[in-house]
Design a protein with these regions (language model features):
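Phosphate-end processing signature that detects enzymes handling 5′-triphosphorylated RNA
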Residues: 1-158
Length: 158
């Protein structure tokens, strides 16, 4: 079991030329209460189940447990998930500091037009370079949690 520490930002510029990998992701939630989310996901050719706990005060750190499971099982579990499926492409972009990799998620469907970037850190105060294409920080803002995007998608914000 591990603690995940990450910072999340909106994306305001073009990042795709810097991406070295792109993977399609489809995911649903068996539980989306903030205290404990249970997610199933198909990421490329692999399946996963993930449990996340409530975040700390800043929203940057929280418990995360993940296990690979067969894609067929994910497909079956998606049928009993809460309404709303998240569909996105995740791009990986090496940071200019050479130490970090940005995960940039471009959303589709009801969340079309939303793009966010996350960077995982060893601790909340670890320094990292911010690429020019980053926008405002949204770390800890619940409306940008994937589990909330399925309930209140981006298309409803306008």
């Amino acid at each position: 079991m591990a603690q995940e520490i990450e910072k999340k930002f909106l994306v305001k510029g073009d990042f795709k030329a810097e991406a070295f990998k792109a993977t399609r992701i489809t995911q649903g939630y068996l539980s989306s209460v903030p205290e404990r989310t249970v997610r199933v996901r198909v990421k490329g050719e692999k399946g996963f189940i993930t449990i996340k706990g409530i975040g700390n005060a800043s929203g940057a750190a929280r418990f995360e447990w993940e296990k690979e499971i067969p894609v067929e099982e994910v497909q079956q579990l998606l049928e009993i998930c809460e309404p709303g499926v998240i569909d996105k492409t995740r791009y990986l972009v090496k940071n200019t500091d050479g130490k970090h990799t940005w995960e940039v998620d471009e959303f589709y469907g009801d969340n079309d037009g939303l793009t966010v970037a996350e960077v995982e850190l060893a601790d909340e105060n670890e320094p990292f370079d911010k690429p020019a294409w980053l926008g405002d920080e949204v770390t800890g803002d619940p409306k940008y949690f994937n589990s909330m995007l399925m309930k209140n998608p981006y298309k409803n914000w306008k």
